[in-house]
Amino acid sequence: MSIPFEVISATLALSIGSFMNVLDSTIVNVSLTHIAGDFAVAPTQGTWVITSYAVSEAIFLPLIGWLTKRFGIVRQYTLATLFFTGASVLCGISFSFGFLLFARVLQGVVGASMIPLSQTLMLSFYPKEKKAMALGIWSMTIVLAPVLGPVIGGWITDSFSWRWCFYINVPFGILSTYIVHSIFRKKGYKDKIEKVPVDKWGLIFLAIGISALQIMLDKGNDLDWFQSPFIISLALIAFIFLTILVIWEWYHPTPVVNVKLFLNKNFSIGALSITIASIAFFASVVVIPLWLQNYMGYTALDSGIATSTLGLSILFTAPILGSILNNLDARKVVVFGFVLFSITAILTGNYPPDITVSYIAGSRFLTGIGLGIFFIPLNTITLSDIPPEELTGASGLYNFTRNIGNSFGTPLAINYWNNRISIHHQDIVSAINVGNPNFQSYINHFSSPLHMKLEMINELITQQSALMGVNDIIIGSGIMILLLIPLIFLARRPIVK
């Protein structure tokens, strides 16, 4: 059966929108030093460019179901994409660091609904036997974007300016908005709008709780976690207000966040699984480029290219899996993906000191195959038992849990990596026998002063410790994914509707 041109056009437009949105969460990661330098702020302050976007998006993701009831799905998506494009322009023309942060907050607020709504709209174009394929295409853009973000950002920053990391959104945002609006208007689509009352207290509890949680996650590593009174305060605020939010929304007749979705067995299993899987996946995505840049002498662009093969394998895996998923038990496919991801991580998590670019690229490619296999059917399992009228809200909440996993994964991975570096460094130093003839021969081989020889040896030990720490991260991520397998078997088998 051939696919109509308007379906292909809508798929392309919606994929561009979701890709552009997710891309902006990582594209500036490699440009922070340039941004901080341009505005004469400390490098540590530069990270607020990431935090401000993440916090505002995290607050509004759970609100998607409520927002679409008030404004309609198509109108909400097109306005969100258009405003996101405008906010990108504001980021690019920023004349001060404060204005840039304001523009990034605006990006997160208006763009939060783009991801779940692009999924909902894309699925609406396909018949039931093709929905899995549509989901495969959509999932591909979501997983590819954070992997390719540093590569694209590094190239743009090196070749042009960090400001073009934002300007690049303009033509794609306008194109996505125009195509989606035109196609749905041509189809005579009418948005269903309900005058849902505003749950003001729910909004307040959500904003305070999520803001505190996201800032705690983003700044915890920099402030030594719970050694900092600021982080402790944020943790308490997040716990108190999110607990109040759950209780309040549970009994509210028109909640901004439908927390009762977690009573759905498949949704709860899927949300928990994607949170943990995102932590495991993002750990290596963050740490490997840092290791390549800080210890192996790679540039940001080179490290991004070396690891981008993970996205390349997803590019091939997702559409193929999507086309055959309806004929398979999604639970078994997820488990197969988990096993493949874990085996690949455990077997390749033994990087040698003389590692080559091809070895890194090959190992990330194999890992990406497992990731691509489990990501799509896990989405299918999660949303399989959700009523149509709650699907958009459930998609927003599911994507929120994925974002939380990413947010947890980054600081946890960096903190764990630093701890493993310290442990391995101590172990290697304690194992050195200064009286060993081989050690003495190595020392005497150089004519430098003794203190320079010791500094050089310490640098070699640190480099080896960092490598061993990376291997620990990769193997640990594989083990985390394996532990999710029993949870998947508790889910009901999704039925194609």
Predicted regions located by residue number:
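Transmembrane alpha-helical cores of Major Facilitator Superfamily
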Residues: 19, 51-55, 82, 136-140, ...
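Hydrophobic transmembrane architecture of multi-pass small-molecule transporters
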Residues: 403-490
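Cytoplasmic loop-to-transmembrane helix junctions
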Residues: 45, 130-137, 390-397, 469
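Small-residue-rich alpha-helical segments with characteristic i,i+4
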Residues: 147-148, 360-439
